[in-house]
Amino acid sequence: MYHLWIKCLAAWIFLKRFNGVHVMHAKAPMYPNEPFLVFWNAPTTQCRLRYKVDLDLKTFHIVANANDTLSGSAVTIFYPTHLGIYPHIDDRGHFFHGIIPQNESLTKHLDKSKSDINRIIPLKTFHGLGVIDWENWRPQWDRNWGNKNVYRNRSIQFARDLHPELSENKIRRLAKAEYEKAAKSFMRDTLLLAEEMRPDGYWGYYLYPDCQNYDYKTKGDQYTGKCPDIEMSRNDQLLWLWRESTALFPNVYLEIILRSSDNALKFVHHRLKESMRIASMAREDYALPVFVYARPFYAYTFEPLTQEDLVTTVGETAAMGAAGIVFWGSMQYASTVDSCQKVKKYMNGPLGRYIINVTTAAKICSHALCRKNGRCVRKHSDSNAFLHLFPESFRIMVHANATEKKVIVKGKLELENLIYLRENFMCQCYQGWQGLYCEEYSIKDIRKI
């Protein structure tokens, strides 16, 4: 009886300490002792090769492809025309491959996809991010609103042509069922093929999950940022997709209307919160790694994020427990020498220094709190605790000469710093480790790895 009471007390302390939140194990980081990674996924090759402008990505510990290409060993993104025969209508109204998934051969698509993967990712030991960017239609019928409604209309006409004898209600039901079945097969089987061919990669679809919390334009001060219940329910229905994914790739692109506003943080926070929820429900043994797509400039502009919005995007992403952030950019970044210099100036200023701040702080917390065997995650997801270097204890120093540039972080973690981390963060242990501070081997988890 005494031992039972002790066990109950320990369980109560555990739940109270961690706010009653069950934290699943995490997959070990892509690179050892790097709990939070920053990737560069912008086509800035011309800056280096044509304009001789080095963006100094390595200086600030940013993971990038060779020569800063859009696709390579670190991250490869597949657009609609790059992988298989993806049926869709493009932004200019051009039709491709039967338009709707039920009107195209899945077998032909997978055969072409196999060839494309071998061509674009020749390395069979590919260990980077494999991102499939299919945004033209969504696999759920009810989510094809607005300009995507054309896929519903085409599906209805397709069913009507095949079954003219059916009533209109039956045709609509049939169209929905056939569309969702074919869309699911296209997305699921493409993912399975990619994972079979390049099993060490981190595979998933860009903008999945989404939570459709874009109503900041109409709500103003009434905006909460919360994902609508119906959208969270629809995400639950995509369990088949989450189970086959090996990573999630949501986005937190900020429009300029959100610049340095409370709404920006609400927008980002709830998108991340939903992504972490999905990551924890996909599998029984570990939470999927979440790599969050962001832009270093406001969407549809060439204006850099403010310091406040760097915290809102990069800082919030790290504090919520994501595995990393991926900076996406357009051809505009490398369109002229002036564009390249603008990106470089921002990189050598607020952007680069903040990246060093957060990635180093995440590593320090992992070392100090989680014995290097886990990553630090907010105890209370809605708190304003961030993984930042303590300014009274650490300094970021940049040393440059004619041939190279180095960033050095000097300082040490003081007792009061450690107390702050323990009060505000908890450990999400990597597979193979357990305990409050990931200090114990977990034989059960090791066998699953």
UniProtKB/Swiss-Prot annotation:
<feature type="glycosylation site" description="N-linked (GlcNAc...) asparagine">
    <location>
        <position position="357"/>
    </location>
</feature>
<comment type="function">
    <text>Snake venom endo-hyaluronidase that degrades hyaluronan to smaller oligosaccharide fragments. In venom, it is not toxic by itself, but increases the diffusion of other venom proteins by degrading the extracellular matrix. In addition, it displays antiedematogenic activity.</text>
</comment>
<dbReference type="GO" id="GO:0030214">
    <property type="term" value="P:hyaluronan catabolic process"/>
</dbReference>
<dbReference type="InterPro" id="IPR017853">
    <property type="entry name" value="Glycoside_hydrolase_SF"/>
</dbReference>
<keyword id="KW-1015">Disulfide bond</keyword>
<feature type="disulfide bond">
    <location>
        <begin position="365"/>
        <end position="376"/>
    </location>
</feature>
<feature type="glycosylation site" description="N-linked (GlcNAc...) asparagine">
    <location>
        <position position="401"/>
    </location>
</feature>
<dbReference type="InterPro" id="IPR018155">
    <property type="entry name" value="Hyaluronidase"/>
</dbReference>
<feature type="disulfide bond">
    <location>
        <begin position="429"/>
        <end position="438"/>
    </location>
</feature>
<feature type="domain" description="EGF-like">
    <location>
        <begin position="427"/>
        <end position="438"/>
    </location>
</feature>
<feature type="disulfide bond">
    <location>
        <begin position="211"/>
        <end position="227"/>
    </location>
</feature>
<feature type="signal peptide">
    <location>
        <begin position="1"/>
        <end position="23"/>
    </location>
</feature>
<keyword id="KW-0326">Glycosidase</keyword>
<dbReference type="InterPro" id="IPR013785">
    <property type="entry name" value="Aldolase_TIM"/>
</dbReference>
<feature type="disulfide bond">
    <location>
        <begin position="370"/>
        <end position="427"/>
    </location>
</feature>
<dbReference type="GO" id="GO:0005975">
    <property type="term" value="P:carbohydrate metabolic process"/>
</dbReference>
<keyword id="KW-0325">Glycoprotein</keyword>
<keyword id="KW-0378">Hydrolase</keyword>
<dbReference type="GO" id="GO:0004415">
    <property type="term" value="F:hyalurononglucosaminidase activity"/>
</dbReference>
<feature type="active site" description="Proton donor">
    <location>
        <position position="135"/>
    </location>
</feature>
<comment type="similarity">
    <text>Belongs to the glycosyl hydrolase 56 family.</text>
</comment>
<dbReference type="Pfam" id="PF01630">
    <property type="entry name" value="Glyco_hydro_56"/>
</dbReference>
<protein>
    <recommendedName>
        <fullName>Hyaluronidase</fullName>
        <ecNumber>3.2.1.35</ecNumber>
    </recommendedName>
</protein>
<keyword id="KW-0964">Secreted</keyword>
<dbReference type="GO" id="GO:0031410">
    <property type="term" value="C:cytoplasmic vesicle"/>
</dbReference>
<dbReference type="GO" id="GO:0005576">
    <property type="term" value="C:extracellular region"/>
</dbReference>
<feature type="disulfide bond">
    <location>
        <begin position="47"/>
        <end position="340"/>
    </location>
</feature>
<comment type="subunit">
    <text>Monomer.</text>
</comment>
<feature type="glycosylation site" description="N-linked (GlcNAc...) asparagine">
    <location>
        <position position="103"/>
    </location>
</feature>
<keyword id="KW-0245">EGF-like domain</keyword>
<feature type="glycosylation site" description="N-linked (GlcNAc...) asparagine">
    <location>
        <position position="67"/>
    </location>
</feature>
<feature type="glycosylation site" description="N-linked (GlcNAc...) asparagine">
    <location>
        <position position="153"/>
    </location>
</feature>
<keyword id="KW-0732">Signal</keyword>
